[in-house]
């Protein structure tokens, strides 16, 4: 898949998950983050890497935060933020519970869900 900058909606979701996880990321992460869509049936999952740390041999470390939201068609969605073995941002894993393509990322996220 093609590397690109994240969209505003993706940035909003990532910022929410990063803040929820209370991890430290560089102050310029928004400017330097490169995303690559995962082959997940268009549910919205992304590989994450900072532009100065492009490495294809990174390994999953752990999930550090997640949130739940409802897509515009009423289907539940779970978004998880994962880091690699070195503690760097690794994946935004989005799972729409009926496996259909994600329609939208909401403007706000409920901190009481999940």
Where are these predicted regions, by residue range?
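Short gly/ser-rich anion-binding loops that grip negatively charged ligand groups
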Residues: 68
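Short, compact, well-ordered microdomains
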Residues: 71-114
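N-terminal domain-onset segments
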Residues: 1-65, 104-114
């Amino acid at each position: 898949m093609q590397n690109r900058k994240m969209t505003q909606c993706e940035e909003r979701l990532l910022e929410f998950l990063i803040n929820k996880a209370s991890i430290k990321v560089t102050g310029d992460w928004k400017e330097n983050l490169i995303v690559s869509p995962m082959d997940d049936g268009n549910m919205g999952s992304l590989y994450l890497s900072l532009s100065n740390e492009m490495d294809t041999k990174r390994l999953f470390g752990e999930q550090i935060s997640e949130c739940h939201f409802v897509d515009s068609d009423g289907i539940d969605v779970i978004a998880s933020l994962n880091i690699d073995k070195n503690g760097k941002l690794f994946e935004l894993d989005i799972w729409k519970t009926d496996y259909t393509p994600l329609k939208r990322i909401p403007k706000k996220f409920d901190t009481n869900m999940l």
